[in-house]
Design a protein with these regions (language model features):
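Active-site SXXK
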Residues: 15, 33-58, 84, 146-150, ...
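Active-site Gly/Thr loop motif
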Residues: 173-174, 179, 226-275
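Active-site helix/loop module of the DD-peptidase/beta-lactamase fold
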Residues: 52-94, 125-127, 153-191, 196
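Structured C-terminal helix/loop/strand segments within mature extracytoplasmic catalytic/sensor domains
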Residues: 258-301
Length: 301
């Protein structure tokens, strides 16, 4: 059980399942919250919204879609959708899950984001510590804003749009669940609130390996996939809601992955045609380095 307690691990090579193992309380097709892996699904949904013209360009300022943001802080006029995709918003927003006395006040905002009845209220008082596009800094508020923009641009709920454009076309094994801030406001937590199973998670990986096609149908444009998987070592490897890593400065020998607390992940190795997906409950451990799976693929495939 090298994949840890309380979880399920799936390895797919050349479209065939070569490893599928779980421990209780998990079982095949059980849905579990995938936490920040949700961000990569939100990035996918953004690409579809761009393809369909709901979002004209990732270079559009966020105020084109949520004009009221400009009233809260003029810097929002400089913030573009691409900055959200790359975690370069510049928000003064603390995100650290280590509970210390010093960090209790700072962690209050992330608690508001995850458990507040209207997370959009956070944007009324948010400050910027960097100019948009200036610096990478991971925080979930950026993807919260991105999911809000998708809903505003499409005039559809996140769940309905995801179901129509991704879940149904890919023939997912089970319905996914999404968390909203409240029934009254109904803003979707696209930054960490999706629950799905390991097989459907792997299908997302296959969609990216297939250049955005599924059974001959283009789900998201190849242009978006290519841009998402663009080989860059800048921005700490985070690009269009995916992490990228390279070995020995060899851009052709690359892998990319989505990762969430508790060790939820999708790992994709293009060169080896391998997808590894995991869901689990390891909340006290952030997990292996993804380079472990690079080495694993080298040895097994």
């Amino acid at each position: 059980q090298w994949f840890g307690k309380d979880g399920q691990l799936l390895i797919i090579h050349n479209d065939s399942i070569v490893y599928d193992q779980w421990t209780e309380p998990f079982y095949p097709r059980k849905n579990a919250t995938i936490f920040s892996v949700s961000k990569s699904l939100t990035g996918l949904l953004c690409g579809i919204a761009v393809d369909e013209g709901y979002i004209k360009s990732v270079d559009d300022p966020v105020t084109d879609y949520i004009p009221e943001l400009a009233k809260y802080n003029a810097t929002f006029k400089k913030l573009r959708i691409v900055h959200l995709l790359n975690m370069q918003a510049g928000f003064d927003f603390y995100e650290d899950y280590e509970l210390t006395l010093k960090g209790l006040f700072k962690i209050f905002k992330i608690t508001q984001l995850q458990y507040g009845h209207d997370f959009t209220r956070l944007f009324r008082h948010i400050k910027f510590k960097n100019q948009p596009g200036e610096k990478y800094e991971y925080n979930s508020l950026t993807t919260a804003l991105l999911s809000w923009i998708i809903e505003r641009a499409t005039s559809k709920t996140y769940a309905d749009y995801m179901s129509e454009k991704v879940w149904k076309p890919l023939g997912m094994e089970r319905d996914a669940w999404v968390t909203i801030d409240s029934r009254k406001h109904h803003h979707t937590q696209g930054f960490g609130g999706i629950a799905t199973n390991v097989y459907d998670l792997a299908k997302i990986g296959r969609l990216y390996l297939n250049g955005g096609t599924w059974n001959g149908k283009q789900i998201v444009s190849k242009e978006w996939i290519d841009k998402s998987l663009e080989k860059t070592t800048e921005n700490k490897g985070y690009h269009y809601c995916w992490y990228h890593q390279y070995r020995d400065n060899d851009a052709d020998n690359s892998s990319f992955y989505a990762f969430g607390v508790g060790h939820q992940f999708i790992y994709i190795n293009q060169k080896k045609n391998v997808i590894i997906a995991r869901i689990g409950n390891n909340y006290n451990w952030m997990g292996w380095e993804m380079s472990f799976f690079d080495s694993l693929c080298d040895k097994l495939f």
